[in-house]
Amino acid sequence: MASSISTGVKFVPEEDNFLQRHVAFFDRNKDGIVYPSETFQGFRAIGCGYLLSAVASVFINIGLSSKTRPGKGFSIWFPIEVKNIHLAKHGSDSGVYDKDGRFVASKFEEIFTKHAHTHRDALTNEELKQLLKANKEPNDRKGWLAGYTEWKVLHYLCKDKNGLLHKDTVRAAYDGSLFEKLEKQRSSKTSKKHP
């Protein structure tokens, strides 16, 4: 796949921009641009299978590339510019990221105050379905599908043995720290299997 021209300078997401931090995990070479191959590698690193990783890399990069590259022509490499990821924010979401990609604590808390009825700090699968239904905006199939897919993959990867998706896990997904944790867990499991 394509790689960007290296300037020797690594891209560092803005500290208060949770959306940039979320996406930066997938920027495997830390140059500020995420190519489909990096999206694939990132999904594999957090424990997704080949098929899900391949499908995710195609749909995510095709869907977000042009939105994060305003004023630039079409690229067959479908790069995503991390610094502009806020321009690709989809509808039918929770509102936890504001228009600039910053974390909105009140919207995050609202997820659990409105939808976590069984356990105060966790969502059941049924409560997750209700959250997705509540977030759905009229005539926004693409945004709803994006949100649905994000939440379902998160639930699949991170639910506990009782099927609960915990508040601290969801917050870590929003700021991107969850991905680093999952990658470390996966690599330690792999190293234990192959000493």
Curated annotation (Swiss-Prot):
Annotated positions binding Ca(2+): 27, 29, 31, 38
Name assigned to this protein: Probable peroxygenase 4
Places the protein is found: Lipid droplet
Family, as annotated: Belongs to the caleosin family.
Keywords, ordered alphabetically: Calcium, Heme, Iron, Lipid droplet, Metal-binding, Oxidoreductase, Phosphoprotein
Phenotype of the disrupted gene, per the record: No visible phenotype, but increased sensitivity to exogenous abscisic acid and osmotic stresses. Increased drought tolerance.
Species of provenance: Arabidopsis thaliana
Gene Ontology molecular-function annotations: metal ion binding; plant seed peroxygenase activity
Main location: other
